[in-house]
């Protein structure tokens, strides 16, 4: 978030967390400071759509780029945003911390029914996406497999946790010729008829809440 504003010569606003408890004040803050781009977790956007805050203020033409990542974005709530701010560009970004930090993107370019899944799109530059089935082979189109990432953005591993590092950062099973690490995300995905990646779920019992990972086993 910081580097993109530096690169484009934009001003970076750190919105006070308390404003997310007051949706109208939050929108007034965006309007007052002439903010034209936001990069939020879907939870924040869902809150505003549920409380119908977008009915109270017209930001169309002012808010021009709306990016979101960290959780699944339901089209039911995204459609509310698109109805109220139709001129904005919407982009769904995906990527775990281990690949610092986004590896796929989807610019919303068509209409979706409320119950349809929103694609996480295609790989970003310098990143390649592998979808591996249960036999560690490339999944066929439409077949569910684990999303794995290779490229220049991979982390070195987990700090002081070599065992977990060895489990998640592994040799690419599709490359028997030389050392090439990939990161196994644990996320299950498939591709649609357009070649776009769709998120299906998790291999384990990890969930996301407000963009933060939670291991249900650790709570138990």
Language-model features: where?
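Short hydrophobic/charged patches on amphipathic alpha-helices used for structural packing
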Residues: 24-27, 55, 220
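Ca2+-coordinating acidic residues in Ca2+-binding motifs
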Residues: 25, 43, 67, 218
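A secondary-structure boundary/capping signal
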Residues: 16, 41, 69, 104, ...
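AMP-dependent adenylate-forming
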Residues: 89-92, 107-220
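Conserved AMP-binding/adenylation subdomain of ANL enzymes
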Residues: 1-36
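Alpha-helix capping/helix-boundary segments
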Residues: 43-45, 73, 154
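Gly/Ser/Thr-rich phosphate-binding loop
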Residues: 3, 7-10, 35-39, 49-119, ...
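Short aromatic-enriched loop/helix-cap "lid" or pocket-rim segments at secondary-structure transitions
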Residues: 1-2, 25-26, 78-80, 102-106, ...
């Amino acid at each position: 978030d910081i580097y993109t504003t530096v690169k484009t010569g934009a001003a970076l606003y750190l919105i006070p967390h308390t404003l997310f408890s007051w949706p109208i004040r939050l929108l007034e803050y965006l309007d007052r400071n002439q903010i034209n781009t936001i990069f939020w977790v879907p939870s924040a956007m869902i809150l505003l759509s549920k409380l119908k805050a977008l009915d109270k203020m017209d930001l169309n033409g002012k808010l021009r780029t709306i990016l979101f990542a960290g959780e699944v974005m339901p089209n039911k709530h995204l459609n509310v945003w698109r109805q109220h701010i139709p001129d904005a560009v919407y982009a769904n970004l995906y990527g775990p911390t281990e690949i610092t930090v986004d590896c796929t993107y989807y610019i919303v370019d068509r209409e979706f029914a409320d119950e349809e899944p929103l694609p996480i799109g295609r790989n970003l530059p310098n990143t390649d996406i592998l979808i591996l089935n249960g036999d560690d082979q490339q999944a066929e189109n439409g077949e569910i497999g684990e999303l794995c990432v290779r490229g220049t953005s991979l982390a070195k591993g987990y700090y002081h946790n070599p065992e977990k590092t060895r489990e998640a950062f592994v040799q690419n099973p599709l490359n028997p010729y030389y050392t090439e690490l990939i990161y196994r995300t644990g996320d299950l995905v498939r591709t649609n008829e357009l070649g776009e990646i769709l998120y299906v779920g998790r291999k384990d019992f990890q969930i996301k809440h407000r963009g933060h990972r939670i291991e249900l086993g650790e709570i138990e």
